[in-house]
A protein has these predicted regions:
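Beta-strand-rich solenoidal segments
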Residues: 3-169
Length: 169
């Protein structure tokens, strides 16, 4: 159990830390739904089962069988001659528009989620990490099939994301 140092004069910071702990617990609860490779178009990410989530406290749903395309050129991954390359994409939605937001390409294991600025006013629903094998052809976001031999893909669902209390207090 977390205890707070009563001698600290920074009571506000202690409260923010406590609220962040609660938020972490709630934020990591499962969101109903799953994602994977598209079936109508294997170049897209598909919502396999409906995703239920909160957007500004309001319940929203992304219907099963919704397929979301990558952005041509912007979401490409350039292959490297000797090192596998990763790129992390987040599936985000505001309940009206659902899209993929790309992080920065990096060596395998070093790619990071896109910045808060890129995520914008959306709820993060899932994470996709694509890896392009070294010495392979590039990943062309508009035409490459996600089950192509030179691509390894991982799909994860996310908990409910919310601003950190320590960021706003």
């Amino acid at each position: 159990m977390k205890t707070f140092d009563k001698s600290h004069a920074d009571f506000k910071a202690n409260i923010a830390e406590g609220l962040d702990m609660i938020l972490d617990f709630v934020a990591n609860m499962s969101v109903a739904g799953t994602i994977g490779i598209g079936t109508a178009a294997k170049t897209k990410v598909k919502v396999l089962t409906a995703i239920n989530f909160l957007y500004h406290g309001e319940p929203k749903t992304i219907a099963a069988n919704t397929e979301v395309a990558f952005t041509a050129t912007t979401d490409d991954i350039t292959a490297h001659a000797t090192v596998d390359q990763d790129r992390t994409y987040l599936l985000v939605s505001n309940g009206t528009t659902t899209k993929l937001v790309a992080g920065v390409q990096a060596d395998t294991g070093l790619s990071e989620d896109p910045s808060e600025e890129l995520i914008g006013d959306n709820t993060v629903l899932g994470r996709i990490v694509l890896t392009v094998a070294n010495g392979s052809t590039d990943f062309d976001a508009s035409t490459d099939l996600l089950d192509a031999a030179h691509i390894t893909d991982v799909y994860e669902m996310e908990g409910l994301y919310a601003p950190r209390f320590s960021d706003i207090m």
